[in-house]
From Swiss-Prot:
Protein name, entry field: 5-aminolevulinate synthase
InterPro entries registered for this protein in UniProt: 4pyrrol_synth_NH2levulA_synth, Aminotrans_II_pyridoxalP_BS, Aminotransferase_I/II_large, AON_synthase_class-II, PyrdxlP-dep_Trfase, PyrdxlP-dep_Trfase_major, PyrdxlP-dep_Trfase_small
Pathway(s) served: Porphyrin-containing compound metabolism; protoporphyrin-IX biosynthesis; 5-aminolevulinate from glycine: step 1/1
Gene3D superfamilies named in the record: Aspartate Aminotransferase, domain 1 (3.90.1150.10), Type I PLP-dependent aspartate aminotransferase-like (Major domain) (3.40.640.10)
EC number from the UniProt entry: 2.3.1.37
Organism: Rickettsia prowazekii (strain Madrid E)
Gene label: hemA
Organism placement in taxonomy: Bacteria, Pseudomonadati, Pseudomonadota, Alphaproteobacteria, Rickettsiales
Reaction equation(s) it catalyzes: succinyl-CoA + glycine + H(+) = 5-aminolevulinate + CO2 + CoA
Residues bearing the modification N6-(pyridoxal phosphate)lysine: K244
Length: 414
């Protein structure tokens, strides 16, 4: 193994030298004290958790999970085709179809798998399909399109003019699909969804939208930005996750019966893996149902988002201005981004994970702040003042959100 160890060590050392080495934080989350956690025997406040609404610890969700555990056991027992098609997952798929006003849904083990295997399978099902993909689409989308080996065009981030130019270059009668996200997880920008829908109609293309960072958070029932804009019925495939606002695990797609059935019969990421256990699918169903009926969590969430952005404006903290709940603070240097994150955690008891390349482009390294309804005014002030002190110590310039927004957005779409 010594020869291969040398190769592995060289690879690791290169990543370390670039300030990109990732270390796991050993955390003990506290279900009864969200958003606190325990880290190295001290209590910390979590500001980067994707459990957007704290639904993982909601009493309805936890009780549903406990009941399912006692009724069905821990595991699912197999793949969906062989012993693992528990009634709980069928109920979940009905709930998801209703959420997005679609005929049916298909659940996967993760959002990554849902994107990857669905997109790759569409190329098997639809001969000569051409993909049109936003340049900042998630790695799971990129992986699915790449493994499809289909013809593809990548359009500039959020640039519908460039997208149309690319669509014009392909025969109108050739099958096409436009793949995009409703909200981009690293910059928080929303896609021009209605403009993309109009282009899809004009150029005879299917639409595939990734709503993982918006389901549960936007829309009357939590159906995401497409529900908020009342255009769910104009999008062919809506993909989402159960692992963020809904507080569980898993991914899904929703569409019409024929498309979903074709994916069900084709996608290896669905066919050849054990299904979600009933304890998870039952919890997810109850989480979705609660957020369909309750708007309280969404309202409180938006209030905290607004308060945090206002605080950052007040302290001149350089966040990337957007309309969403995702609040990136651009550092622009991997070493400094790591230092800021470590100082927040070790000196102030605040956990914000730094985001470096390859997750974001080089030169746009950042912290990504994720507010929840449980974050208090004191927590907001503590985070803001800690950042000001750390920026001063590390000689990181404070600048207004408006100024930075122009500079960084040009960098992102160049």
């Amino acid at each position: 193994m010594s020869y291969y160890d040398t190769i592995f060590n060289k690879h690791i050392d290169k990543i370390k030298s670039e300030g990109r080495y990732r270390e796991f934080k050993s955390l003990k989350r506290q279900a009864d004290n969200f958003p606190f956690a325990e880290y190295e025997d001290k209590q910390i406040v979590m500001w980067c958790i994707n459990d957007y609404l704290g639904m993982s610890k909601h009493v309805k969700v936890m009780q549903a999970s406990i009941d399912a555990l006692l009724k069905y056991g821990v595991g699912s027992g197999g793949t969906r085709n062989i012993g693992g098609n528990n009634i709980s997952i069928l109920e979940l798929e009905k709930e998801l179809a209703d959420l997005h006003s679609k005929e049916t849904a298909l659940v996967f083990t993760s959002g990554f798998v849902a994107n990857d295997t669905t997109l790759a399978s569409l190329a098997k099902i639809i001969p000569d399909i051409v993909f049109f993909s936003d340049e900042l689409n998630h790695a799971s989308i990129i992986a699915g399109i790449k493994s499809s080996r289909a013809e593809k065009y990548v359009y500039r981030h959020l640039d519908v003019q460039h997208l149309e130019k690319l669509l014009q270059s392909v025969d109108i009668n050739k099958p096409k699909i436009i793949v995009f996200e409703s909200a981009y997880s690293m910059d928080g920008f929303f896609s021009p969804i209605k403009d993309i829908i109009n282009l899809a109609k004009k150029y005879n293309a299917l639409t595939f939208i990734d709503e993982v960072h918006t389901v549960g958070l936007y829309g009357k029932q939590g159906g995401g930005i497409s529900e908020l804009l009342d255009c769910s019925n104009q999008i062919d495939i809506i993909q989402g996750t159960l692992a963020k606002a809904y507080g569980t695990i898993g991914g899904y797609i929703t569409s019409n019966y024929n498309l979903i059935d074709a994916i069900r019969l084709t996608a290896p990421g669905f066919i050849f893996t054990t299904s979600l256990p009933p304890v998870i699918s039952t919890a997810a169903t109850h989480s979705i149902r609660h957020l369909k009926e309750s708007n309280e969590e969404r309202i409180k969430h938006q209030e905290v988002v607004t308060k945090l952005k206002n605080s950052f404006e007040h302290f001149n903290i350089p966040y990337l201005k957007n309309e969403s709940h995702i609040i990136p603070i651009i550092i622009g240097d991997p070493i400094k981004a790591t230092k800021v994150s470590n100082m927040l955690l070790n000196e102030y008891g605040i956990y914000v994970q730094h985001i470096n390349f390859p997750t974001v482009p080089r030169g746009t390294e950042r912290l990504r702040i994720i507010p929840t309804p449980a974050h208090t005014d004191k927590m907001i002030n503590d985070l803001s003042t800690a950042l000001v002190h750390i920026f001063d110590e590390l000689d990181i310039e404070l600048s207004s959100a408006k100024e930075l927004n122009k500079e960084v957005r040009l960098h992102l779409i160049a």
